[in-house]
Amino acid sequence: MEMDIDCIHHLDFSGHSTLTNTPSSDNDNYGCSWNHWSPVVNWDAFTGNQDDFHHLIDSMIDDNNTGPAFSDHTASTTSEEEEEEEATTTTMTTTTTTTTTTPEAADDDFKGLRLVHLLMAGAEALTGANKNRELARVILVRLKELVSHTDGTNMERLAAYFTEALQGLLEGAGGAYNSSSKHHVIGGPHHEPQNDALAAFQLLQDMSPYVKFGHFTANQAIVEAVAHERRVHIVDYDIMEGVQWASLMQALASNPNGPHLRITALSRSGVGRRSMATVQETGRRLTAFATSLGQPFSFHHSRLESDETFRPAGLKLVRGEALVFNCMLNLPHLTYRSPNSVASFLTAAKALRPRLVTVVEEEVGSALGGFVERFMDSLHHFSAVFDSLEAGFPMQGRARALVERVFLGPRIVGSLARIYRTGGGGEERGSWREWLRAAGFSGVAVSSANHCQSNLLLGLFNDGYRVEELGSNKLVLHWKTRRLLSASLWTCSSESDCA
């Protein structure tokens, strides 16, 4: 799969928004300005009138053009006919808006509540004291009559994926489900056409701050942590196509005295040769991109064990390098990674005492509680995700449906299967915050510039997003009252910290 990584030139802050809130400016209501950043980075380079990020995905799709939906002009969220229809609908909505709840909205709310009750009853019928497989079967038949993956309201589409997950558990397939074999990811194993996966990734970038929030927070912290270093070594747990690092390279290259950057990506032998080949191709493209910037750069990979655990002995270290561990976990576009694999990576970080450890993770409920309790928490979480996408792009139904089908649907099915298989606890865990503290890591404070950057990012999206500072070292992305994902900063750089 060819990819022109030359086209990733910025952090995708173009100074405008296609969404519903006010565009960000030099002085917005967050009290942040693009012109007031740490001198470590030339942020002006990231706020020009560039829109090259999309060329990356476009070029990847062009090289894999097999003709599925969204393949001809990816990120085009609708066809010309749909745009005309949407323009008409928008006009009608504008002229008929009232402050009262319409009968249609009331009906949707009633149906949504009914679906929630049916889903909860279905979950209860599959486990616990009230387990009744025949009742579960009847409930699922009724749910299938009421929902659709492609039509209807947000709640109806969401319920369709949860119904699919419950059906898999009832039939026994879900209990043995392994999301790494079904989750549709860029550059990874999947059952969707590659063009659909690439298109969905670009659309997810356009529709929400989920991916950018983690990348930008981690990158800003890294730049600050290595400001005066001559050599930097980043160990990346799940590099995918390397999109995160192109923007960091540009930040480092903007400093005349910037450091040499080395990235070690982990490859997974358990997935076969494809994983290693993908990592090597990512390294080739990142190397070419660094050369185009004049950024000193080298790339290596380290293979995980067959059980996906990490052994630090396989890591090549050079004296004088500032070591950074980067860990992106279970975001919508990423493959699920087991807690044992993640723990082995973080344990290695503890042994090697890096300058900084960045952890970006999905915010889920506690790993405690039974299946029904965690089922409802998952329903609440994904309801917030679906709502946030619709609020940002209310008219682009086909685009949202693609993101839901490629990323969110498989994530729902896989997550519920793991919860069910472990009886509600165990493998599917909550935040890594307590684990890191118990292991001896200490938090690294999030800088005011980093927090300000997050607020500016959210200014490009719908007003329902907000960022919360949790403690001094963690930023949490919210949709309204629901936590979606977080970015936290850690270190274990001294013997006393890691004892």
From Swiss-Prot:
Q: Where do the record's region annotations for Leucine repeat II (LRII) lie?
A: 281-313
What are the boundaries of the region PFYRE? 323-414
Summary of the knockout phenotype? Roots of knockout plants form very few aborted and non-functional nodules under nitrogen limitation when inoculated with Mesorhizobium loti.
Biological-process GO terms, alphabetical: nodulation
Identify the tissues in which this protein is expressed.
Answer: Highly expressed in roots.
Q: Which PROSITE patterns match?
A: GRAS
Enumerate the residue ranges of region (SAW): 417-491
Name the keywords, alphabetized: Endoplasmic reticulum, Membrane, Nodulation, Nucleus, Transcription, Transcription regulation
Q: Which superkingdom does the taxonomy of this entry point to? A: Eukaryota
CC annotations in GO: endoplasmic reticulum; nuclear membrane; nucleus
Location of region: Leucine repeat I (LRI): 113-182
| Domain GRAS, residue spans | 106-491
Which portions of the chain have biased composition (kind: Low complexity)? 88-104
Span list, region VHIID:
201-265
Motif VHIID in this chain: where? 232-236
**Region annotation (Disordered) ranges:** 64-106
Q: What upregulates it? A: Induced in roots after inoculation with Mesorhizobium loti. Down-regulated in developmentally young regions of roots after inoculation with Mesorhizobium loti.
The record's subcellular locations are:
Nucleus membrane; Endoplasmic reticulum
Family of this protein: Belongs to the GRAS family.
The entry describes its oligomerization and partners as: Interacts with IPN2. Binds to RAD1. Interacts with RAM1.
Function according to Swiss-Prot or TrEMBL? Transcriptional regulator essential for Nod-factor-induced gene expression. Acts downstream of calcium spiking and a calcium/calmodulin-dependent protein kinase required for activation of early nodulation gene expression. Transcription factor involved in the induction of NIN and ENOD40 genes, which are required for rhizobial infection and early nodule development. Does not seem to contribute to the early steps of the arbuscular mycorrhizal fungus infection and colonization processes in roots.
Q: Report the protein name in the record.
A: Protein NODULATION SIGNALING PATHWAY 2
Lineage summary: Eukaryota, Viridiplantae, Streptophyta, Embryophyta, Tracheophyta
Q: Which gene encodes it?
A: NSP2
